[in-house]
A protein has these predicted regions:
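Glycine-rich His-Gly loop
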Residues: 54, 80-81
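Short cysteine/histidine-rich metal-coordination sites, predominantly Zn2+-binding motifs
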Residues: 70-78, 91-101
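N-terminal pre-ligand scaffold of iron-sulfur
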Residues: 1-74, 86, 104-146
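Short metal-binding segments enriched for Cys and/or His
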Residues: 83-93
Length: 146
């Protein structure tokens, strides 16, 4: 373990960054932090902290404030009815919208290259990051090249 200061340390190929006090999550259960060019959403779920990429891969919109289901370990993107497992990042449901909405979007995609890419985008999991609490501080771990 290599300690740089009280804000970060390395452990193998993991760079650990101190992002917040655990008590700060009592008022705001979800918070977003920029860690080594990664925008990370950390959510307090019970007594645990889960960290994941903060933006849905479908359209790049923020998942801050999205509903969490602790029984199924899911976060639900509030924009396109997509859900992900917050433990492993796998897709649970991908753009689960009614058929008429899909047809409407496909029609408009004929006129927009960007919209066409979003409509045709394959299921994409979210990145998951490690967390730990040390002396009442929440730390997030990022893999770095050796």
């Amino acid at each position: 373990m290599t300690e740089n200061n009280n804000k970060e340390f390395t452990e193998g190929n993991i760079l650990w960054k101190n992002v917040a006090t655990a008590s700060s999550f009592n008022k705001k259960e979800q918070q977003v932090f920029n860690v080594n060019k990664n925008e990370i959403l950390i959510a307090k779920i019970g007594d645990e902290f889960k960290a994941m990429q903060s933006r849905c891969p479908h359209a790049g919109l923020s998942m801050l404030g999205s509903q969490m289901n602790s029984e199924k370990d899911l976060i639900f993107c509030k924009w396109h009815n997509t859900s992900f497992c917050y433990k492993d990042g796998k897709v649970d449901k991908w753009v689960d919208v009614p058929p008429y909405q899909k047809k409407l979007v496909k029609f408009f995609a004929l006129f927009s290259k960007k919209l066409k890419q979003m409509v045709e985008m394959p299921e994409t999991p979210i990145d998951i990051f490690r967390t730990q609490v040390i002396e009442e501080n929440v730390w997030v771990g990022i893999e770095v090249a050796n």
